[in-house]
Amino acid sequence: MSVDKMNQAILNQLRLNSRKTWQQIGKDVHLTGQAVAARVAQMEEQGIISGYTIRQDQLSRHFITVFMQNSEFTRFENFLRENPRVESAYKVTGEGCYQLCFIADTPQEVERFLDSVLPFGRCKVLSAIRCVK
């Protein structure tokens, strides 16, 4: 699954604004809209593009390290997959068992989520205060 320079240019355009039309992207990367659509479809088939999403305010992100206190890993991972506010979740080595990125609009949402994680283990939370990049 290699990505050539043209596909990389298309991916960069989609990262900047995934609502652009194929024609708009084509103009930016010097292809026709049809050629862009074909390349995007090919990247979807290859698994290079697996979905489209929105970016929410960076300061609503909370980085949570979970230290499991039981062996209910499968149940915990299913719990994470079912929660739409969990933007990403990684099983990690080093400090902790899982690293989560949780999106919340209010401190109360963070508190409710942490309360729901307690049956699985304890947490350490880092909250974004300013986006650097």
Which residues does each PLM region occupy?
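A compositional/biophysical signature of low hydrophobicity enriched in polar/charged and small residues
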Residues: 1-133
